[in-house]
Curated annotation (Swiss-Prot):
Catalytic activity: di-trans,octa-cis-undecaprenyl diphospho-N-acetyl-alpha-D-muramoyl-L-alanyl-D-glutamyl-meso-2,6-diaminopimeloyl-D-alanyl-D-alanine + UDP-N-acetyl-alpha-D-glucosamine = di-trans,octa-cis-undecaprenyl diphospho-[N-acetyl-alpha-D-glucosaminyl-(1->4)]-N-acetyl-alpha-D-muramoyl-L-alanyl-D-glutamyl-meso-2,6-diaminopimeloyl-D-alanyl-D-alanine + UDP + H(+)
Bilayer topology annotation: Peripheral membrane protein
Pfam families: Glyco_tran_28_C, Glyco_transf_28
Organism, scientific name: Lachnospira eligens (strain ATCC 27750 / DSM 3376 / VPI C15-48 / C15-B4) (Eubacterium eligens)
Main location: membrane
CDD domains: GT28_MurG
Gene Ontology MF terms in the entry: UDP-N-acetyl-D-glucosamine:N-acetylmuramoyl-L-alanyl-D-glutamyl-meso-2,6-diaminopimelyl-D-alanyl-D-alanine-diphosphoundecaprenol 4-beta-N-acetylglucosaminlytransferase activity; undecaprenyldiphospho-muramoylpentapeptide beta-N-acetylglucosaminyltransferase activity
Organism superkingdom: Bacteria
Compartments in which it is found: Cell membrane
Single GO BP term: carbohydrate metabolic process
Protein name: UDP-N-acetylglucosamine--N-acetylmuramyl-(pentapeptide) pyrophosphoryl-undecaprenol N-acetylglucosamine transferase
Gene3D superfamilies referenced in this protein's UniProt entry, alphabetically: Glycogen Phosphorylase B
InterPro entries for this protein: GlcNAc_MurG, Glyco_trans_28_C, GlycoTrans_28_N
Length: 354
């Protein structure tokens, strides 16, 4: 039986594509191991699935000045030694990395032992972690055609992003029961990402009285970001994070308000869910979500509202227009050619395993 190490973490977007590959990996006869951080969201998500999980030390790679820039390199170095020991212990035939800071020592450790590495880059332009790791990569998968020009020729492969197939199997009755909603009003799903989005959360809450006149709202706020004063509000329910029943929430939703992380928007595309994207601002990120959102807007898959332009009036108007035009967005998404990502990635894994 061949062995594969999966790595990636920090946010759910660096984990869910790995989870999406699990059924196909098991069907192909791979023994799966996961290397992540000690306390990241990946630990909870992977251990809940019964996959052998190994935590290592990791430090954030920053582009800005911070006192932690003095200590984090030592954490990365410690993580590298830990990852090397794990490579020696597990002896994987291949490593698949979804990125995030914890993946860097894992990829470097694999490269030092001449273990094939496949990296997946979901965003339009490579993040810092993948920029460092791609030097050791055998192949680099990407999500957008525009990304190919940023990747080494001969290594880059356009695959799209793997989507958890169970998301396509949502149960409307289960979703309505979870939220205690009815079928009397359409439902808006608000997704701030696994770590939450304070600006999006606050903006949605500011127009909640108006929204609830015409819609029901299910709000995924992020850990520690719920507003207890809103508990019990008719037509509104909030959760920190939902994993297994996410498919049921998608099933009941007419439209979705979301950040523009690459994996999140690819799930919306696969589900053909009309969506309003509010990308993380360039001031708070490297601007990758803005690029992702604009690409989907140009293809007619999404409406986009920037944080800078977002206020009560613009957000409410955007939601109403999105709902009014929802059928056209569905038609546009049905024409998309971004599919079969899992099959493409599995072929790369099989072809490049030792």
């Amino acid at each position: 039986m061949k062995k594969i190490v999966l790595t990636g973490g920090g946010t759910a977007g660096h984990v869910t594509p790995n989870i999406a590959l699990l059924p196909s990996l098991k069907e192909a006869g791979y023994e799966v191991f996961y290397i992540g951080s000690y306390t990241g969201i990946e630990k909870t998500l992977i251990e809940d699935l019964g996959i052998p999980y190994y935590g290592i030390s990791s430090g954030k790679l920053r582009r800005y000045r911070s006192l932690k820039n003095l200590s984090d390199p030592f954490r990365v170095l410690h993580g590298l030694f830990q990852a090397k020991r794990l490579m020696k212990k597990i002896k994987p035939d291949i490593v698949f990395s979804k990125g995030g800071f914890v993946s860097v020592p894992v990829v470097l450790a694999a490269g030092s032992r001449h273990i094939p590495v496949i990296i997946h880059e979901s965003d339009m332009t490579p993040g810092l972690a993948n920029k460092i790791a791609m030097r050791k990569a055998t192949k680099i998968c990407c999500n957008f055609p525009e990304t190919l020009k940023y990747l080494p020729e001969g290594k880059a492969v356009l695959t799209g992003s793997p989507i958890r197939q169970e998301l396509l199997l949502g149960n409307k009755a289960a979703g309505l029961d979870l939220c205690n909603f009815t079928t009397d009003k359409p439902i808006i799903l608000v997704v701030g990402g696994s770590t939450g989005a304070v600006h999006v959360n606050d903006a949605v809450r500011s127009i909640l009285p108006e929204l609830l006149k015409d819609f029901q709202v299910v709000h995924l706020c992020g850990k520690g970001k719920m507003d207890d004063s809103l508990n019990g509000t008719p037509g509104y329910v909030q959760f920190e994070y939902i994993s297994e029943q996410m498919r049921d929430l998608f099933a009941i939703s007419s439209i979705v308000i979301s950040r523009a992380g690459a994996n999140a928007i690819c799930e919306l595309l696969a589900l053909k869910k009309p969506n309003l994207l509010i990308p993380l601002s360039a001031n708070a990120s490297r601007g990758d979500q803005i690029l992702n959102a604009n690409s989907f807007k140009e293809h007619g898959y999404s409406m986009v509202l920037t944080e800078e332009d977002m206020n009560k009036d613009t957000l409410l108007a955007a939601v109403r227009k999105l709902y009014a035009d929802r059928h056209q967005y569905i038609i546009n998404m049905e024409k998309s050619e971004q599919q079969d990502s899992i099959d493409k990635i599995m072929n790369l894994i099989k072809d490049n395993s030792k």
